[in-house]
Amino acid sequence: MDKRKIKKSKEDYLEAILIRINKYGACRVTDIAEQMGYSKASTSVALKKLEEEGCIIKDDWRVLLTDQGYAIASRIYERHNFFLEWFQCIGISKDIAEADACMIEHVISDESFEKIKEYLNQVREK
């Protein structure tokens, strides 16, 4: 499998966990599977890898983010929300903005993202 696909998948899982915890205070394997549209079995396999990488901790019924997992998830979630809002502000439909934000959040470099944010903040201040 392509490294970018693995990275995207990992980031999507971590982002889904973060969103679920922020919204409901807890997150279960079944919640993640439902949210992402995957089977519980394939979700469990992916979460096992994330646990081995030190990104999550699983107990009997819930999934928690480690500091490392939280940092990755927060970074991706910030990018997603930034691009979603920006795209909608410039007139892109919500569905297309959502899809494009979801793609860009995984591939844009930290440097490019920060420069775009700085530029748009300067434009807003004028």
What are these regions (language model features)?
Residues 2-38:
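N-terminal helix-turn-helix DNA-binding core of bacterial DNA-binding proteins
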Residues 75-89, 96-103, 111:
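Short, solvent-exposed amphipathic helices
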Residues 41, 95:
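Key DNA-contact positions within bacterial/archaeal DNA-binding proteins
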Residues 13, 32, 43-51:
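Basic amphipathic alpha-helical segments that dock to polyanions
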Residues 51-60:
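A short, conserved structural fragment
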Residues 99-126:
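C-terminal regulatory/oligomerization modules of transcriptional regulators
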Residues 61-79:
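Basic, amphipathic "hinge/linker" alpha-helix immediately C-terminal to the N-terminal HTH DNA-binding motif
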